[in-house]
Each structure stands twice: as structure tokens, then as C-alpha cells.
């Protein structure tokens, strides 16, 4: 077992530095990607207390709900629809300061106010996305993007190692 010990009085960047090293060691040696994604979503959710942290996995022409922490979520998202679908389509991170102002936003939860979605790649193809929602406006910034992309890199290495 592994306990996550992230002091609450640390800055966002210090929390990220801490969680990156802990997640890296947590997933070391685990070959099942669903288990890896499950614990990563739990660790991020536990550390930052955001509304929703989870993964959608590409299956055919849809993103299918994967491991997550938070309220009940949408099961399927089409390519190009909502923030997750647009992240898949454009293959780049999208930060949404106010989801009400994002054209085509899919409201899986009425509590969501801001969002960040990052693509996950396997062999140059989109494997899925990491989706994080907050109950506050303007939650996510470049610091979040920088460190969450490092965490996505850990996932991508696991996908390649376990091919």
C-alpha cells in the first residue's frame, strides 16, 4: 500500500512536485493500465479536491468513460464534441476558465465551472484524455498544464512499456 502525504499548506506547484514523484513510484511495477489510471485519478482528486478527475478512453469513434473520482459522469463522448472531444480532435491540452462560455460544452455535472483536458497518446495515436473539472471559475492555468502533462507522460510510458 501507499499513502499519499501531501501537506495542505503547500503551494500548488509544490503539491504537483510532490504528487509527480509519489505517482511515479506508486505505479512502478504495475502493468494493468486500468489500475494505474484508477490510482492516478484518486491521487489527483485526493491532493487537489477538485470536483471530478478521470479518464476517457478512445474506443472506435467515441471516448468511453474510464476510471474516475467524483460525481457520476457521461458514459460516451463523440470526437469533436465538448472539451474532451475537442481535445481528442485537436490533440492538444485545452484549459477552459468558464465552461459556460465554451461552445458545445457537455455539462455532465451542473457543478462544473472550469475544466482542463489533456490528450494521452500511445504510439502517436490518441489513447484517451485526462479530464479535470472544478467547482470554481478560473481554476486551471499553465502550472496545472505543465505538471499534468508530466503525469500524462508517466501514463504514456506505462502504455508503451505494457504493449
Over which residues does each language-model region extend?
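Regulatory sensory and allosteric helical modules in signal-transduction proteins
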Residues: 51, 58, 62-108
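Generic recognition of well-ordered alpha-helical segments
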Residues: 42, 150-153
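Short glycine-/small-residue motifs
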Residues: 128-129
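Intrinsically disordered, low-complexity terminal regulatory regions
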Residues: 1-67, 158-163
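A short, aliphatic-rich beta-strand micro-motif
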Residues: 114-121
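Regulatory loop-to-helix N-cap segments in sensory/regulatory domains
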Residues: 2-7, 133-151, 158-163
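Short loop/turn motifs at secondary-structure junctions and domain boundaries
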Residues: 47, 107-112
